[in-house]
From Swiss-Prot:
GO terms for cellular component: mitochondrial inner membrane; mitochondrial matrix. Keywords: GTP-binding, Hydrolase, Membrane, Mitochondrion, Mitochondrion inner membrane, Nucleotide-binding, Protein biosynthesis, Transit peptide. Belongs to the TRAFAC class translation factor GTPase superfamily. Classic translation factor GTPase family. LepA subfamily. It is a peripheral membrane protein. It comes from Brugia malayi. This is Translation factor GUF1 homolog, mitochondrial.
Length: 651
């Protein structure tokens, strides 16, 4: 693919940026000198003008070796010592190390052949496509990594098109060529057919053994373009990542497009129009190291006077306070992926609510695709309704909490009647329905409903096509594309309602294909749908925690399931408990059942003596008990244990 190289202006007139290094090594010339002197080494970042900078990322399907390749880069460039490295050095989250996947985009600065290489490691799981898109905004090219034993997978295709549409230079790399199961000719053929790569463009490596790593680093220097920046222009940088440090506050990752940013400088955000002082400037190698300045084309981090976790907005443009705002050309804001799944989260201990609240808002700083709303449950107390990108995304920030069954966002379009709109809906024509409590009280007000859709890409063996097609059709799917990659592999695209796949669709998909399938899904807007409100009543009181919004064809089965579970979970009371499921506010039951009351057998106290006044005493007791239970039914509430809520809400 042709690369247009930008002219490389020299660096501006900032005092030298110095990096103080302890026992950290970069490329071999530095390594030898440091080993001889065993002293702190000063690195001048001003020695790296834009023509000596390469900002790149690694993208691939999950488990194709991105993190392992990043580890080898760090070792070969001397950023870490081989004897002391831990695997997956850029993976910091617990779920990343447990599952061997990358969730958050991580950055690291390395030095090779007198060039500064800024690596942005990216996730490969379908739930984290926003992380990939976000990291690509800071790069000028990517390494498209494909495992030789698995070939091109669904996420490989999605990542290729993300990079291609962003105009990035792409270097194809085939990993795991040392495995016995590797089929390199087949993978080369797939990359030719799908992406139009020439065999001569493809690099062959084994990240595990370190084979071919030097060739990849050389290709990054020789084949990727330098950043297109203006060193002598006023400061213009954009925020592409952020996270929260307990002792420092928000840490902001920036890519400097124009000018220089330095410690002590006062900066302003373009979109939120807030002013801050830069307290620390640094780069990641892979840990945080402080420098004096970041120059045009370089990537690093900032610590500023930002106090709130909401101040560091992803995609924000930073500029110097002395510059006129109307002279600044802002970078385009990065639009986060709309949450696909909503779930309510409650602390298992009510005393941990404040700690959970703080943790969630710190989470939102680092991941703007997460949405947070306050929630309250009669049984579970105060909590939060969270919008996530997917199931694994939910697990990413799991803690000692109760998570309810996930649901999707529906929308109700209200009839174009200004009186109704102003009186009941504050003038809003489209109402978001995140749970049963949001459902309009008057169904006659609704013109139609909308449900979220996804575009699902599947790569699977031709032997499983019939079973997979049946599964997708049952999920109300519509096939969009069907292409054969080779004699054994086929790529299908489906358009599906997300409500049909957000629960166990992918588990069933893997089961019917024996695991030989990969998938990627993308947000694909809304379309008209037929949905209903399944309302659960206990003793004629609506219980919104158990009620759900769902497609009409699923209502009956789900109603039976919930009523059955409630009968099993709710303990017997001193009075009758009636459970029923209805459509919306209708009084007609779809499914209903009764939990019989606990009986108090006082006839034993009469010792079988019903003669004389015994029978009168017996009838008197029955009358008192009946009146007492009626009074309890009117004044009291059904006691539903917390465990019952958890067991019913979890599917």
């Amino acid at each position: 693919m042709a690369v247009t190289r930008a002219a490389a202006p020299m660096v501006g007139n900032c005092s030298s940026a110095m990096l103080i290094i302890g026992r950290r090594y970069f490329s071999s010339p530095f390594t030898e000198k440091l080993r001889k002197t065993n002293r702190k080494k000063v690195i001048d970042l001003a020695a790296y003008p834009p023509k000596k900078i390469r900002n790149f990322g690694i993208v691939a399907h999950v488990d194709h070796g991105k993190s392992t390749l990043a580890d080898r880069f760090l070792e070969m460039t001397g950023a870490v010592e081989k004897s002391s490295h831990a695997s997956q050095m850029l993976d910091k989250l617990q779920v990343e190390r447990e599952r061997g996947i990358t969730v958050k985009a991580q950055s690291c600065t390395m030095f090779h052949k007198d060039c500064m290489l800024n690596l942005i490691d990216t996730p490969g799981h379908a739930d984290f496509s926003f992380e990939v898109a976000r990291s690509l905004t800071a790069t000028n090219g990517i390494l498209l990594l494909v495992a030789a034993n698995q070939g091109v997978q669904a996420q490989t295709v999605a990542n290729f098109w993300l990079a291609f549409e962003a105009g990035l230079t792409i270097i194809p790399v085939i990993n795991k060529v040392d495995l016995k199961s590797a089929n390199v000719p087949r993978v080369v053929s797939q990359m030719e057919n799908l992406f139009d790569f020439l065999p001569s463009e493809i690099l062959y490596i084994s990240a595990k053994n370190g084979t071919g790593i030097g060739d990849v680093l050389d290709a990054v220097v020789e084949r990727l373009p330098p950043p297109k920046v203006e060193a002598h222009s006023p400061l213009r940088a954009h925020v592409f990542d952020s996270w929260y440090e307990t002792h420092h506050g928000p840490v902001v990752c920036v890519a400097v497009h124009d000018g220089v940013i330095s410690k002590g400088q006062r900066i302003r955000t373009y979109h939120s129009d807030c002013e801050y002082e830069v307290l620390v400037v640094g780069i990641m190698i892979p840990n945080m190291y402080e420098v004096k300045c970041l120059y045009a084309g370089q990537v690093g981090y900032l610590l500023t006077t930002m106090k709130s976790v909401q101040d560091a907005v992803i995609g924000e443009t930073l500029y110097d306070v002395s510059d006129e705002r109307n002279m600044v050309q802002p970078m385009p804001l990065i639009t986060p992926t709309p949450p696909c799944i909503y779930a309510s989260i409650y602390p298992t201990n009510i005393n941990e609510y404040n700690a959970l609240r703080v943790a969630l808002y710190k989470l939102a700083l680092n991941d703007s695709s997460v949405q947070i709303q306050h929630s309250n449950s009669t049984a579970l107390g105060n909590g939060f309704k969270i919008g996530f990108s997917g199931h694994l995304h939910m697990e990413e920030y799991d803690a000692n909490i109760t998570i309810t069954a996930p649901s999707v966002e529906y929308r109700a379009v209200i009839k174009d009647n200004q009186t109704i709109l102003k009186k009941r809906y504050n003038g809003q024509r489209v109402i978001r329905l995140l749970d049963a409590s949001d459902f309009p009280v008057c169904p006659s007000d609704i013109d139609h409903f909308l449900e979220p859709m996804i575009k699902l890409t599947l790569l699977l063996s031709t032997a499983y096509c019939e079973h997979v097609e049946r599964l997708c059709v049952d999920a109300r799917g519509e096939q969009v594309e069907n292409n054969g990659l080779d004699t054994d592999c086929i790529m299908q695209q489906w358009r599906l309602p997300f409500a049909e796949v957000c629960m166990d669709f992918f588990d069933r998909l893997k089961r019917i294909t024996s695991g030989y399938v990969t998938y990627n899904y993308q947000w694909d807007g809304f379309q008209k749908a037929t949905i209903e409100l399944l309302m659960i009543h206990i003793n004629d009181l609506p219980i919104y925690e158990f009620s759900e919004i769902m497609p009409s064809n699923q209502i009956k089965a789900r109603a039976k399931e919930i009523v059955k579970k409630l009968k099993e979970e709710i303990p017997r009371q001193q009075y009758e408990v009636r459970i029923k499921a209805t459509l919306g506010q209708s009084k007609k039951a779809l499914v209903q059942t009764v939990i019989a009351p606990v009986k108090k057998d006082f006839t034993g106290r009469l010792k079988g003596n019903f003669g004389g006044s015994g029978w009168e005493r017996f009838c008197k007791k029955l009358s008192h008990q009946k009146k007492g239970k009626e009074r309890m039914k009117q004044l009291g509430q059904v006691q539903i244990p917390k465990e019952a809520f958890i067991n019913v809400l979890r599917r």
